[in-house]
């Protein structure tokens, strides 16, 4: 995601998370070749830092909980994918990066979490958990995957609605709308967690990428999943 800000003097942070994107799809790691087109990531790489000795939990919820709290999964209790009400979920009493920045940093931050959550099940009693854990704004979906990128449920500060804008586009739109409300008196922290490229694989809007040669049929997707990655 690229945008122009008038906030360069502030220590603003945007943490972008891609879902189910392994380094085996990225040619800028040793002995690996691009199997997916990632032009924006490659552009970021030219002015950024590439870490080559980094480890994370191999599945979604423990990895997110680790980034969120800075603690191992045996500490947070989130040791596997959260798939049902019986799955261990993140204790809202955990100290999070959002709480630290919003409530305890020398200069307090505005905070937002936009996109996939997957630290709790999506039940009404938990819709405000992201806010309770340090975010001024939460807008996204709690589940491990959305069944349809063109229609899904969204929780926004404890209220559910149905979204019919393509999920990746809606996530960016929500982020830009929130950043437009920021000012130069207070820095911001944005956790931006895309559902993509997690399955279900599908034909994305032609306005976002080159879809030539892709039919979008279930047969083609099953036979050539990497083309839809």
Language-model regions, residue ranges each:
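Bacterial Sec-dependent N-terminal signal peptides
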Residues: 1-11
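Formylglycine-dependent sulfatase
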Residues: 10-229
